[in-house]
């Protein structure tokens, strides 16, 4: 895969209909919301989780496309496995005197061993070389600053969170059944957003990509993941979520040809009717100002 040599900045536009895009565990799993503005929020962690799930499903068992942070993973065990595969015994003194005459802490890498472990992790795990990771626990593979960074997603206009009462025609225990006299019903609640269009921003650094081994092929796969991640992550709780657009600004250099905020300002998302609550993507217009683009900037609009 070819080396990434161009900076990229991008905008993600996705929506939710009758679902909870990202519950807040500190607020009874209600949809995340900015209490001052009423804007809906989706964390960067939530978006990266969906990318990881997409890669796991579509790149299963392909070398170099495993996922480090996955469900039920024991991260320290994975880090220790790196050194086993590298043939580095962390209970013996380092092979090179440059790394120390003795092992400072048994079971923990030191000196250039950490660099070897970090390189192995980047080569093996897509999410490590993409988003970075803190791997300084356990056997210690250091830290990786990811070339791809995401912001929180924020709804274009304020959202409304609705609470619905639901009924299950069953109970969990015999005691509950006896208490209800055989009626066997369980009441519950479900929180949804009727409709929300969310906007997130992302950044790709070629300098950091060269350090982690994140390639142009990895970038293509990442954009494919953004476009399709909701298709493979359906649940009743999340309702209908769709990636509507991925708008990419490709720079003609590693350092970039324009500030990211100036490029993002060119993407204008406005309600068609500001007085009527939006209930579909058609209730918004999306315009990308491509007039008088800074020299070296190329705009690509990917649609889901």
Language-model region placement:
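RNA-binding basic/glycine-rich loop and surface signature characteristic of RAMP-family CRISPR effectors
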Residues: 1-304
């Amino acid at each position: 895969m070819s080396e990434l040599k161009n900076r990229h900045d991008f905008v993600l536009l996705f929506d939710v209909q009758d679902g909870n895009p990202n519950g807040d565990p500190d607020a009874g799993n209600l949809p995340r919301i900015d209490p001052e503005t009423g804007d809906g929020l989706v964390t960067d962690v939530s978006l990266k989780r969906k990318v990881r799930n997409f890669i796991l499903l579509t790149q299963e068992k392909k070398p170099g496309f495993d996922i480090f942070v996955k469900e039920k993973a024991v991260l320290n065990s994975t880090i220790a496995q790196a050194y086993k595969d590298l043939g580095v015994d962390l209970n013996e003194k380092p092979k090179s005197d440059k790394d120390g005459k003795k092992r400072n802490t048994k079971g923990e890498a030191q000196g250039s061993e950490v660099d070897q472990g970090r390189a192995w992790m980047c080569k093996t795990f897509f999410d490590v070389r993409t988003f970075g990771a803190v791997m300084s626990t356990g056997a210690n593979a250091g830290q990786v600053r990811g070339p791809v960074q995401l912001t929180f997603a924020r709804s274009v206009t304020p959202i409304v969170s609705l609470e619905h009462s639901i009924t299950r025609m069953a109970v969990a225990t015999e005691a509950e059944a006896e208490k209800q006299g055989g009626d066997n019903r369980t009441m519950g609640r479900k929180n949804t957003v009727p409709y929300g269009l969310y906007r997130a921003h992302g950044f790709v650094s070629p300098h950091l990509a060269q350090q982690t081994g994140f390639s142009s092929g990895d970038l293509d796969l990442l954009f494919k993941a953004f476009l399709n991640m909701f298709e493979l992550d359906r649940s009743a709780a999340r309702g209908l979520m769709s990636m509507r657009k991925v708008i990419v600004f490709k720079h003609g250099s590693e350092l970039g040809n324009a500030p990211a905020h100036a490029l993002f300002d060119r993407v204008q998302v406005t309600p068609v009717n500001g007085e009527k609550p939006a209930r579909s993507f058609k209730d918004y217009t999306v315009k990308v100002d491509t007039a008088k683009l800074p020299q070296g900037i190329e705009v690509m609009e990917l649609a889901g």
